[in-house]
């Protein structure tokens, strides 16, 4: 079991830079009502954290694609508490960020291998990657513990990634969650990910889950 990541710029920005997106910047989004002017555009991905014990319904008008859809590169999550790293993998494997990963970084090699692999092979690729495990551990928080137990526990908070597809010509945005049945394709958008349509999907999830424990960050590059 891995230790969970925090959904904060202080954790995710250096992590992204370490895995090969040298000019990545990460910003907190504290409100869904107004799009902050201080966030540089374009925004290439959003990472949303919510309580996984809640009931998350598929947004009206969206559809679940096959796990091995060629529109996006989707990774299954099989390691407890690995959702933060899976979310980052989804971000850098799709949309504009996939074209910004350093060619010499091991993540670029992992992405290439994953694209030619079955879903089961992708899961094993992540499970067997000592480099990825070490990177996650370097940026993870302290172990979660239950009083009276020495065992680590699985967090209830879960990361999902909103990002565009692999092709520059694909204007749909996608919801990528390694615990679900596959990638979710949403509507086409004309702008970047910091968009009213995308925020509407996130608002829908917040309203459907009775909990204050949510966080949202935007990933940008110059």
UniProtKB/Swiss-Prot annotation:
According to the UniProt record, one GO cellular component term is:
cytosol
**Entries under InterPro entries matching the protein:** Papain-like_cys_pep_sf, Peptidase_C12_UCH, Peptidase_C12_UCH_sf, UCH_AS
GO MF terms on file?
A: cysteine-type deubiquitinase activity; deNEDDylase activity; metal-dependent deubiquitinase activity
Superkingdom assignment: Eukaryota
The positions flagged as active site in the entry are 83 (nucleophile), 158 (proton donor)
Query: Mind telling me which residues the site (Transition state stabilizer) is annotated on?
Result: 77
**UCH catalytic domain segment(s):** 1-221
Marked site, Important for enzyme activity, at: 177
Q: What is this protein called?
A: Probable ubiquitin carboxyl-terminal hydrolase 1
Which organism is this entry from? Schizosaccharomyces pombe (strain 972 / ATCC 24843)
